[in-house]
Design a protein with these regions (language model features):
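Flexible coil/turn and secondary-structure edge motifs
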Residues: 1-216
Length: 216
């Protein structure tokens, strides 16, 4: 399998995207990233193939996707005025990478059905179906509601080697991700102060309503 580019500036974007996807997989990808040196037009039968054949062999209905598409244009990076609405602890956690004291936040023991969003932007981050009791003292999830909403960074602070997770639009510090989740999964260890929880029954009639099938 390969990804081929015509503009050398695209190479870094492709490699960054692959690195983010690789974080969700244990086996290394076997995907080459190379300049496009040869290109041949397909025969007429395959021109505009899916327009001519809506149920064609290479068509995958979006409705079968296991995770939703989160439109990044629907959310904005918070302004200084927006950040002033945060509590002192929420500000310290999201903006200065502070950490909630273990077992101190109410969302640690929240297990109702609903959606967890970035407290600084409202961007969806986690669904309740992926939350589990980790007994570590912080809200824990096996995966985000969609891969693209999380950013990953190496964190060597405090004499440890960890992977920090931040929100896509707000660049808010969320917590860290570890490899000790249930049944070989990951554990996203998230500060409750970085999250806002919206119960399932409050999603109806909002811009989040389409996400209901992905939180149960």
């Amino acid at each position: 399998t390969g990804i081929y580019y015509t503009d050398s500036a695209d190479k870094a974007i492709i490699e960054t995207t692959l690195a983010r996807a690789q974080a969700f997989e244990r086996k290394p990808f076997a995907i080459e990233v190379l300049p496009l040196d040869n290109y041949y037009s397909a025969e007429e039968y395959h021109q505009d193939y899916l327009d001519k054949n809506p149920n064609g062999y290479c068509h995958i209905p979006l409705g079968l996707s296991q995770e939703p598409l989160i439109d990044d244009s629907a959310y904005n990076k918070p302004t200084e005025k927006d950040l002033q609405t945060l509590s002192p602890q929420e500000f310290e956690v999201t903006q200065n990478a502070a950490t909630d004291a273990p077992f101190s936040h109410e969302l640690t023991d929240e297990f109702k059905s609903g959606l967890y969003v970035d407290i600084t932007t409202g961007e969806p981050l986690f669904g309740s179906s992926r939350k589990f009791e980790s007994h570590c003292g912080w809200p824990s999830f096996t995966k985000p509601i969609a891969k693209d909403v999380i950013r990953y960074y190496k964190d060597n602070s405090h004499g440890m080697q960890r992977i920090e997770v931040r929100s896509r639009i707000g660049n808010a510090h969320l917590g860290h991700v570890f490899e000790d989740g249930p049944n070989g999964s990951l554990r996203y260890c998230i500060n409750g102060s970085a999250l806002k929880f919206i119960p399932k029954n409050e999603l109806l009639g909002t811009k989040y309503e389409y996400l209901i099938p992905y939180i149960d």
